[in-house]
UniProtKB/Swiss-Prot annotation:
Family the UniProt entry places it in: Belongs to the EF-Ts family.
Keywords (A to Z) from UniProt: Cytoplasm, Elongation factor, Protein biosynthesis
Source superkingdom: Bacteria
GO cellular component, as recorded: cytoplasm
Gene (name only): tsf
Protein name as it appears in the record: Elongation factor Ts
Function: Associates with the EF-Tu.GDP complex and induces the exchange of GDP to GTP. It remains bound to the aminoacyl-tRNA.EF-Tu.GTP complex up to the GTP hydrolysis stage on the ribosome.
Region (Involved in Mg(2+) ion dislocation from EF-Tu): 80-83
Principal cellular location given in the protein's record: cytoplasm
Gene3D superfamilies: 1.10.286.20, DNA helicase RuvA subunit, C-terminal domain (1.10.8.10), Elongation factor Ts, dimerisation domain (3.30.479.20)
Cellular location(s): Cytoplasm
Length: 281
């Protein structure tokens, strides 16, 4: 039987990123054949990744990349904030984002393209990893802003870089849903109007006064959920629309992504319990 040397273990660790004991075990089982050990580890890594696939991945990072009037926002998820800061995880996310910007691939295409790398990463770090969302923005003038790793915004429009950057920061903080009040869909407006009419009637106001109240409340509602109607966070006495007009700027579109939006975590588990389960997995 061939001897498993420390040098072989070291080489296998460098090539796979796996732990020392895992590398030694793989070499023993492969009779010190490093290529066979790597093949076997890849196979067992795939099995490990499959076991991790059911674990909720609601942490992670938003990556933004820009080039020549194009930008990509990518969300890659993991299970814990600790792994979200891991160099291997961030390198993987950056690689996927770079490929996305170059190809404008769909999330399904990116998932297929990077599945082998994802499986290897799951085996290495021991957490479920998921390429979840990708969105693209095109424009003559683009600005982006990331709040830590968790929130990413890209704004496209007309104007100087500083103004659009400030708008991106505003979007990160204030979460507008539409660019302008008139962009709010008719069904959303109608649903809110029903609510406001009922509230006014329940307050016992005369019909004429109730109607005026509803008009005012609806104007406030559409303003609060649209970018240009919101109070600008850096100058709250002005709306974003007023600030843009003063600067001779405009916004055509924006995209805001936040890590874990819409993902339901398992109920009844504390963070420590989730980590313990991940370690057992």
């Amino acid at each position: 039987m061939a001897t498993v040397t420390a040098a072989l273990v070291k080489e296998l660790r460098e090539r796979t990123g796996a732990g020392m004991m895992e590398c030694k075990k793989a070499l023993v089982e492969a009779n010190a054949d490093i290529e066979l050990a790597i093949e076997n580890m890849r196979k067992s890594g795939a099995a490990k990744a499959a076991k991790k696939a059911g674990n909720v991945a609601a942490e992670g990072a938003i990556i933004i990349k820009e080039e020549n009037g194009s930008a990509v926002l990518l969300e890659v998820n993991c299970q814990t904030d600790f792994v979200a800061k891991d160099g291997n995880f961030t390198a993987f996310a950056q690689e996927v984002a770079a490929a996305a910007l170059a190809s404008k691939a769909t999330v399904e295409e990116l998932q297929a393209q990077f599945e082998e790398a994802r499986v290897a990463l799951v085996a290495k770090i021991g957490e479920n990893i998921n390429i979840r969302r990708v969105q693209y923005v095109e424009g003559t003038a683009i600005a982006s802003y990331r709040h830590g790793e968790k929130i990413g915004v890209v704004v496209a429009g007309e104007g100087d870089a500083e103004t659009l950057k400030h708008v991106a920061m505003h979007v990160a903080a204030s979460k507008p849903e539409y660019v302008n009040p008139e962009d709010v869909p008719a069904d959303v407006v109608a649903k809110e109007k029903e609510v406001q009419v009922e509230i006014a009637m329940n307050e016992g106001k005369p019909a004429e006064i109730a109607e005026k109240m509803v008009v005012g409340r609806m104007k406030k509602f559409t303003g609060e959920i649209s970018l240009t109607g919101q109070a600008f966070i850096m100058e709250p006495k002005k709306t974003v629309g007023e600030m843009l007009k003063e600067k001779g700027a405009s916004v055509a579109t924006f995209v805001r992504l936040e890590v874990g939006e819409g993902i339901e975590k398992a109920e009844g588990l504390s963070f420590a319990e989730e980590v313990a389960l991940a370690q057992k997995g």
